Amino acid sequence: MREKEWHTYEMIVNGLPQKIRYNADTVEGLFLPLLRRLTEMQRAEARRILVFLAAPPATGKSTLAQFLAQLSRTEEGLTPVQALGMDGFHYPNRYLAAHTILRDGEEIPLTSIKGAPETFDVPALAAKLGAAREESVTFPVYDRRIHDVVPDAVTADAPILLVEGNWLLLDEEPWRDLCGLADHRLRIDAAPELLRDRLIARKVQGGSTTEAAAAFYEASDAPNILRFAAHAGAADEIWRMTADGDFTRM
């Protein structure tokens, strides 16, 4: 097996500059074939199509979605893709602070489980996705600089809309009805221990101590990772993230 050739790219992801890297063979053998299939699908349907990219935390799904969108506009013969995040449909912080949920017999504020399925406005997401199939619409975004939702921040108008998020394929009410809105469903799986290491490292890079980062993982991230794995719905194709951050098709 020959050594992987990694290419570095500079992008803006979630409003922040990022340097990312992808394996050149993965770009040629996985990313571009996906974009060609989506191009064929969109042209055959002769309308806007919706693609769901569902993955657990720390798989780089937001970055991947943005990269695929960028690739679609730089490679000849591809239909343009627009990347959109599900995180814009978080309930606003003021709502989360004012509402609670019962967990293990204890009533806790929604702010303490932000990012869990219960902290999203699923009816609003479903309505927006349904409308987006028929016309150009505005989408909210989640701004990580202020850690809150910004309404009507972007216009979704590309022929292919690639929507990414943790729970788009969650096989639980009220989420499971969303899958019928997608023309193509892609899921990324990853080993929980790999995600743990990546999430703790990300927190430490953000200024947390290793102990605090590990505690946050156990309280917040770990339940979400387990829930994703246990209740992931059907997908048209499944990729797996490897230990070096590469992707393979299963």
Where are the language model's segments positioned?
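Walker A (P-loop) phosphate-binding loop of P-loop NTPases
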Residues: 58
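Pre-Walker A adenine-sensing motif
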Residues: 32-44
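ATP-dependent NMP and nucleoside kinases share a basic, alpha-helical "lid"
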Residues: 146-202
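Charged, amphipathic alpha-helical linker segments immediately N-terminal to NTP-binding catalytic cores
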Residues: 1-30
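Conserved nucleotide-sensing/catalytic segment adjacent to the nucleotide-binding pocket
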Residues: 82, 89-143
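Hydrophobic positions on the alpha1 helix immediately C-terminal to the Walker A/P-loop
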Residues: 64
